[in-house]
Amino acid sequence: MDIKKQYLQNEEYYHEIVDKKTIYLHHTAGSHRPDWVIASWERDKTGSGGVRHIATAYVIGGKSTRDGNTDFDGVIIECHPPEKWAHHLGIKANNNKRLNQESIGIEICNYGPLTKKGDEYFNYVNGKVPADQVVDLGYDFRGFRYYHAYTSAQIEATKNLVVKLGKDYTIDLSKGMQTLLNGPVLMPEGLDTLGQQKWLNMQGYIGGNGRALTEDGLAGGSTSNTNYAINSYKEALNGKAFELNKQALAGATGVWTHTNVRSDKTDLSPQPAVIEMIKSLGE
């Protein structure tokens, strides 16, 4: 597959090499140009003028909402080596750094949620989005029913890139969102605490500490790692794949979206093409 490179300056990302466990899908909340996204990260500074170290390893271009230009549609640009890292999640939790270190981020150029005014659709900067680039979810997701559509070329490029990264970094693509979308393996009935711990470990569930469960037969209190994993399993049964997820927040392996760790984000939105792409990973 064709992956272009437009590397950020050295100080814009961390050069520490970290084993990868997860892949996170984002959208940029911006225009179709991936090179412009990367250039904006170069300019992005703290209030005191320091480097922010905010980026994803990859950005995938889209289709212009102004003139329909497709020169960048599905174009993948790598802006730092995927084995290295930068901040892209922004979680207000003690494990934020670890989750960023252990993940590979992919941004898709897309404006995100849209507002309908009459028969027209507008993004958050009041730019008009053509009707043929709009998805009507049929229900509100995070307060919005209409979203800028991810293009077919973006979906294909995202899938190909995720599959490649899964192979390169031994990330199980059947974990994470695919488990939620396809439905989890059901826990056998009648298991005691030790049996539940063994089963949860076999299925890849982890405790709130980000580790496999200790198989000691002790349930512990309501905030124990065993109960954290059991509640994660119950959460998976509800099938809310694009909502906050306990396993994602703990650092469980697999493919996730930004919405799985941030309640204030809309990336990715649950568009049918995205759902089918994630469900098909590994096929």
Q: Which ranges hold each PLM region?
A:
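Basic/polar, cationic surfaces and motifs that engage anionic cell-wall
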Residues: 16-17, 101, 109-283
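Active-site-adjacent loop/helix surface patches within enzyme catalytic domains
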Residues: 2-173
